[in-house]
């Protein structure tokens, strides 16, 4: 039998569960990398979703708890603060979201974390590959404060 080569788990500023439920810790202890899917929070961390009207009719997100009106309104507080940080840094919000994951990966006691963002255009793929590769300690502290202040409302699915 082949040993586990990687663990695929949802991870983003929108979904930090693996940092709190011992998945990341266990992967680090066993030297198993994490493949972080949906690192852009189903698109909300790209800066292109500012209201529910930005999500096309028939999109599955309309059926997800985090995208219901009250939850979405609350969750936009987190998104707006991430967008402000991106603006100050001169990068796209998606680059901040991906850099946060890369920086988590470099912390002691964390596994290697490989984000796998989607890209609907060549420009988005290029954008996701560039920009903010890692965040400064002060930026990480700012993001941690944002996450503590604005807990995401609604279940993942």
Locations of regions flagged by a protein language model:
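Beta/alpha (TIM)-barrel catalytic core signal, keyed to glycine-rich beta->alpha loops juxtaposed to Asp/Glu
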Residues: 1-148, 152-156
């Amino acid at each position: 039998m082949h040993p586990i080569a990687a663990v695929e788990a949802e991870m983003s500023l929108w979904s930090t569960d693996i940092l709190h439920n011992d998945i990341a810790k266990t992967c680090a202890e066993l030297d198993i990398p994490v493949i972080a899917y949906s690192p852009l929070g189903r698109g909300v961390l790209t800066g292109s979703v500012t209201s529910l009207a930005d999500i096309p009719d028939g999109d599955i997100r309309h059926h997800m708890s985090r995208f219901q009106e009250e939850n979405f309104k609350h969750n936009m507080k987190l998104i707006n603060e991430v967008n402000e940080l991106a603006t100050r840094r001169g990068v796209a919000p998606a680059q901040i979201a991906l850099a946060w994951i890369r920086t988590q990966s470099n912390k002691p006691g964390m596994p290697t974390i490989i984000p796998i963002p989607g890209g609907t255009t060549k420009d988005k793929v290029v954008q996701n590959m560039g920009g903010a590769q890692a965040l400064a300690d002060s930026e990480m502290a700012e993001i941690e404060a944002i996450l503590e202040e604005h807990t995401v409302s609604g279940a993942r699915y």
